[in-house]
Amino acid sequence: MANQYRVTVDELIQTLSAWDGLITGRKKIHLIACGGTALTLLGYKASTADVDFLVPDKNEYARLVTFLKEAGYEQINRHRWKRPGEILLFDLFEGDAVFTTHLLASPLEPGRNRKIREFKKIYLGVLNSIDLIITKLFRGNAVDMDDCKLLVENEPINFDELKARYKETAEYETSQDKVLRNLEVFLQRIQK
């Protein structure tokens, strides 16, 4: 049975605030929201089915994983973490890849993420709109297409930049024809 629970911004912020009080070390851990989590944090969706974070820095990722294990979370698969008895699911992506899509630049570079909130030990941002659209269109399911349309309707998108970055990102994809077709379908759908 699919997970019917949905996470709101308030619930996510409460969880991250609790984590912030327990994480050891002085340096911040950068959590860059992607997927439906980003759209929820931006206020375009009321909730998300699970929490998707990109953790670009490998040392920060290692610190986060150590914390999660100490806090009782279990790794369900390569990316997914869950604490027994809780419903909240976290998908954590290390480095510059969201699912199987490798970004052309680190989301920690200027302009590659938007700050949502900064705690003492956690920086919470969302992936920039163009990279968010690219990662969603590479998956290409109906929900992802709808999410991209939502971004186009609410964010200033430079379509020349989107097309160029999308095509360059597609060069590194094993199913290049499929993802390029996803872009064509999407652009026809929004008529840009």
Specify the residue positions occupied by each region the protein language model found.
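Compositionally biased terminal segments of proteins
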Residues: 1-192
